[in-house]
C-alpha cells in the first residue's frame, strides 16, 4: 500500500521516526493532532481525493495547524493532492472520469498548479484552463517524479528540469517554458 511504501522509504531506508496521521480511519484527539504536527520536523501530505482531504482537514482544523506549522519553519511536502492545497487553485480529476475541473487551494503560492502533467488529457485540460481564465494568470505544472522546492524568495526544481513547467500569459498568448533553476536530486 501507499503508506507501507512510505514507511519502508522513510523508516527503513532513511532511518526517520515516522508518525502517520489518518483522519478517515482513525479518530485522533485534538491533542494527538496538535502534538504530531508540533513535534514534526517534516510533514508529508499524501495524494488522493482532493475534495475528501480538504473536507477532512477543515473538520479537524488541519488546514490552520498546517499553515501555522509552515509559518513556524516546519518543512512541508506534498504529493499530488497533498501539493495542490498550497496553490491558488489546481486542476484535478472530476472523480467521475469525464474530465478535469478547477479546485481552490489556500493561496500560499499565488499560481495555478497541475500535478501529473505527463498525462496528456490533464496537460490539455490545464492549457485550456489557463487560456480561458480571465486576467493575468501564472501556472506551474510538474510531471511525475519531479518536485518543486518553494521558499519565500524562490522556486527550485528537484529532479529533471525538463519535467517542470511554468506558464504565463503574454499578449493573450499562453507561454510555456521549463524552469531554469534546478537542485540536484539526491534521492
Model regions and ranges:
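N-terminal beta1-alpha1 cap of cysteine-dependent amidohydrolase-like domains
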Residues: 1-42, 46, 175, 183-187
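General beta-strand structural signal in soluble alpha/beta enzymes
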Residues: 20-22, 44-45, 77-79, 139-141
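Catalytic-core regions built around general acid/base machinery
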Residues: 35-39, 60-73
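Catalytic nucleophile loop
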Residues: 44-47, 70-89
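Glycine/threonine-rich flexible loop motifs
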Residues: 50-60
Amino acid at each position: 500500500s501507499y503508506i507501507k511504501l512510505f514507511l519502508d522509504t522513510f523508516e527503513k531506508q532513511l532511518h526517520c521516526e515516522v508518525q502517520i496521521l489518518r483522519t478517515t480511519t482513525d479518530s485522533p484527539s485534538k491533542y494527538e493532532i496538535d502534538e504530531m504536527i508540533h513535534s514534526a520536523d517534516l510533514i508529508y501530505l499524501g495524494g488522493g481525493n482532493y475534495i475528501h482531504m480538504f473536507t477532512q482537514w477543515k473538520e479537524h482544523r488541519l488546514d490552520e495547524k498546517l499553515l501555522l506549522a509552515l509559518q513556524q519553519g516546519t518543512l512541508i511536502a506534498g504529493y499530488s493532492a497533498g501539493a495542490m492545497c498550497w496553490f491558488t487553485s489546481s486542476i484535478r480529476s472530476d472523480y467521475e472520469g469525464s474530465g478535469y475541473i478547477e479546485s481552490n487551494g489556500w493561496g500560499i503560492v499565488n499560481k495555478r498548479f497541475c500535478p501529473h502533467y505527463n498525462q496528456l488529457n490533464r496537460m490539455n485540460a490545464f492549457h485550456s484552463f489557463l487560456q480561458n481564465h480571465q486576467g493575468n494568470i501564472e501556472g506551474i505544472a510538474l510531471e511525475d517524479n519531479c518536485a518543486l522546492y518553494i521558499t519565500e524568495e524562490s522556486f527550485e526544481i528537484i529532479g529533471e528540469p525538463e519535467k517542470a513547467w511554468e506558464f504565463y500569459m503574454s499578449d493573450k498568448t499562453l507561454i510555456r517554458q521549463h524552469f531554469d533553476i534546478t537542485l540536484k536530486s539526491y534521492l
